Structure formats: C-alpha cells, structure tokens
Amino acid sequence: MTRVFSGVKPTGHLTLGNYLGAMRRWAAVDQHRSDALFCVVDLHALTVDHDPARVRRLSRQAASLLLAAGLDPELCTVFVQSHVDEHARLSYVLECVATDGEMRRMIQYKEKAARERVRGGSVRLSLLTYPVLMAADILAYGTDEVPVGEDQTQHVELARDLAVRFNQRYGHTFVVPRATSPAVAARVMNLQEPASKMGKSDDTGPGIVYLLDEPDVVRKKVMRAVTDSGRDVVYDPEERAGLANLLEILAACTDGEPAELAGGYDSYGALKKDTAEAVVEMLRPVRERHMELSADPGYVDGVLREGAEKARAMARPTVDDAYRAIGLLPPVNAAR
C-alpha cells in the first residue's frame, strides 16, 4: 500500500488555503487509499522568533482541526512531530550527506532569511537546515507520496536527492518519495494581495480566511476581496489574479471549473456573494466539529498519544538502519 506523509506547521491559525490545498484531500482521498500519516510539525515552528506558549496552543489547535476536517484515527495516523524522537535523530544523519550549498539555494530559506534581516533579526541555523528536518520527516516513514503545495516541492526534491545519495553511498535504506498536489486550489491566494499565497503567518488578516472565522467574518472578507477595475467576469490568472482567485476558490468549493463558472456571472458582486456562501457552508461542519473536540481535550490527547506510538514504531526501524548504514555503533541490546 502507498504510504503518504504530510504535515502542518503551527506558526499561525490554519486557513482556507490549508484546507482547500491539503486538508480536505487528506480526509477525502489520502487516508482512504493509503497508509497515511499526518503530522503537526511543531519543531519547524522554532526556526524563527516565537512565543513558546503560542506554539503549544497552536499545535493543539492544529491537531484538533485536522480531526475536525475529517481525519479518522482509525484510518490514518495523526501525531505531533516532537513526540517522535526519530525525526530529530534522522535529521542529523541526513545533515551529514547534505551540503551547505544545497541549503542556501532553497528558495524559502532565501526569502525568510531576507525578511528576518530586514527586521533586524539574526538568521537561526535551524532556518538553514529546516529542509533537512523536513526530509527526515518524510524519509523516516518510507514515504511514497508527499501531498504539498507548489511552494514546498523544492523541499521534497531535496528529500529525494538525499535519499538517493544516502542509498548510493551506504546501501539502500530509504524509499525515494515524490511530491503530489491537487489540480484545483493547490495554492489559494491572499484575498487582499492576490499575488501572494494565503499564508497562516501573514500579517494581512483581512485577506486571510481562517478556518475558525465566524461566518459573518468570512462573508466580509470575501466581499471585500481585491479584484480589478474591469466589469466582465472572465478567468484570466495572469492578467486578473484577484478575480481568478475567487473563481478558483468557488470551483474548489463546488467541484466546478473556474473558466466555466465565470460564464455564469455578469457582476463581481454576485460572484463574491456566491463564493462567500460556498466557503461558509464548506467550513461550517469543520467549525462545529472543532467546537466539540475543544470541549473534549482528553480525546485529542489520546489520539495524539496513540498516533505518536504508531509513528514511532514505523520510523524506528528505518532510522536504526540508517544509523548502522552510516557507521554508528548500535546500543548493545540492539546489536545485530
């Protein structure tokens, strides 16, 4: 059976972009067709300045939202990255086959490091090595497929390169993974800045629809979405990005095609109204289930505890094999 691994980083409240770009497919498709693992990658949240209490709070919220979005612990494994030591263990070993040049060529590193310097901050080493930890997340589980947005495909390519390089140098140890992404709404854009991804860490709150936004807040944000000065509704991502973003969101909510949907509207207002209502109705069961889970923290704790145990049992043999392959002496009670 195909093994799938993907994760969410608790650096902000999860958004419509997270849901349409990843979480909905995880629940509707990936957990049913594969041996799937979904992880709250909290270690990745430490690469920049952060509030420890907020990271803990958002980690729990992210786990609850994964379950609220439809992930079923009976069908897949849901856990928190830092609860499974094998991620950190494997990350160091992979750093020993990665190169400094590879890390500095990562697009996200360049962008995030530049923003940090503009703010007058120092760039943490963990930001540079972030892609290696992500590779460890993937390779520890013998992952075949990694559902990601297009902004993360370079990191999956690095994981592939490190797996191949390690296998060639030290013997076959890792499955070589591949990135996958849905055709529609793989990258939902900011409603106020349609050239930018709708990111949970952004400061432009009016342009971001959060999964836990109240329905009236969702409606207000969509109705105020940036479009252009035109009047006709056409699907043109290159020239009319804001309008195209609304059509893509509506298409993702209704299983339609953006270009075909455009033909059914003669005004931006009507399109915005229908898009807002489609988003509200799609997110309604997620919000309601999240409220139920928030009232039962013991259930979420149990899911995460059992998920970590399952994940650890899957990852440990691969990580132990990697340690032996690269030349590390195993503990006496684990010697072969």
Swiss-Prot record:
Gene Ontology process terms (BP): tryptophanyl-tRNA aminoacylation
Keywords associated with the record: Aminoacyl-tRNA synthetase, ATP-binding, Cytoplasm, Ligase, Nucleotide-binding, Protein biosynthesis
Binding-site list for L-tryptophan: D137
Catalytic activity: tRNA(Trp) + L-tryptophan + ATP = L-tryptophyl-tRNA(Trp) + AMP + diphosphate + H(+)
Enzyme class label: ligase
Location of the protein in the cell: Cytoplasm
Gene Ontology CC: one annotated term: cytosol
Residue span of motif 'KMSKS' region: 197-201
Keyword Aminoacyl-tRNA synthetase belongs to the record: yes
UniProt xrefs under InterPro entries: aa-tRNA-synth_I_CS (IPR001412), aa-tRNA-synth_Ic (IPR002305), Rossmann-like_a/b/a_fold (IPR014729), Trp-tRNA-ligase (IPR002306), Trp-tRNA-ligase_bac-type (IPR024109), Trp-tRNA_synthetase (IPR050203)
Motif 'HIGH' region, residue numbers: 10-18
Molecular function, one GO term: tryptophan-tRNA ligase activity
Main location as per UniProt: cytoplasm
Binding site for ATP: K9, P10, T11, G17, N18, G149, E150, D151, V188, K197, M198, G199, K200, S201
The enzyme's E.C. designation: 6.1.1.2
NCBIfam families: trpS
Stated role: Catalyzes the attachment of tryptophan to tRNA(Trp).
Complex formation: Homodimer.
Family in the record: Belongs to the class-I aminoacyl-tRNA synthetase family.
Name of the protein in its database record: Tryptophan--tRNA ligase 1
Organism: Streptomyces coelicolor (strain ATCC BAA-471 / A3(2) / M145)
Taxonomy of the source species: Bacteria, Bacillati, Actinomycetota, Actinomycetes, Kitasatosporales
Gene coding for it: trpS1
